[in-house]
From Swiss-Prot:
Protein name, entry field: Methionyl-tRNA formyltransferase
Single GO molecular function: methionyl-tRNA formyltransferase activity
Domain of life from the UniProt record: Bacteria
EC number annotated for this UniProt entry: 2.1.2.9
GO cellular component, one term: cytosol
Amino acid sequence: MNELKIVFMGSPEFALTPLKMLLAEGYDICGVYTQPDRPAGRGRELCPPPVKTLALEHGLAVYQPQSLKKPEEQAFLKELKPDVIVVAAYGLILPQAVLDIPVYGVLNIHPSLLPRYRGATPVAATLLGGDEWAGVSLMKLEAGLDTGPVYSRSMVAIRPEDTTPILADKLAFIGGCMLLELLSQIPSLPEPKVQDNTQASYFGMVTKEMGLINWQTSAVEIERRVRAFFPWPGVFTTFNQKTLKILEAKPRNLGLGLKPSEVRVYEQSRVMVGSASGELEIIRLQLEGKAGCSAADFVRGQRNFDGVNLGV
């Protein structure tokens, strides 16, 4: 058992890998903070965050405060006497009183190359931006939104098939490795480097409305949204007054002369849709009330698809 006492704060799948890596290294996780259970699914039953499930499987103490701004919550956290707090997509703001508790500060795994893409959804922002590289920044948390000084950064090339969950998994592993390397240097931590705020950009929460396709944008932009907003909120349009989700797509430049939103069944089984620039080839899609399927299967079941305009 490593004698360093760690409080871990995280909620979604992204936080699972760093927590697993800390456990595998034998660190003393004296408490796990995660968001409260939320209603989910059609039945709106309360569902625990993924981190809570993992923590309980390992017999760890789990805490789910609505906020850490209350003095009593801060006093309780202080009683845990953490040497360091590790944050990975926790989702709650940490006030200065909390940041001051651990001996070696609060370390945050942020999945972007800070100061680029500060905010709540940096992985989706990276894909939307069309960047060639994604990355992780291991930073010392301060009161500002992802403004703290950075201990280290690591980069990974973005592949054409990367969606938000695929890329997030890669970055979570990289971030976990970076975290273990930094923790091994305690008590002699290096001096983190201040961010260049003039280069900062922000991206907030993703909303359902962001998934609605604007066919007046380019095929390249729409395809980026398909990958960035998978699996939620998804990217969608309408067909025959029903929601049509685009699950997988590729931008093309075939010179078909299609107007934005106009569908062309190409080579009998391929589906092309016009945009402001280029065609969007739909690879997989899902009509409201149906299972997802390939474009070829969809065309076989929708004989009137060729020539329609989507979203009208």
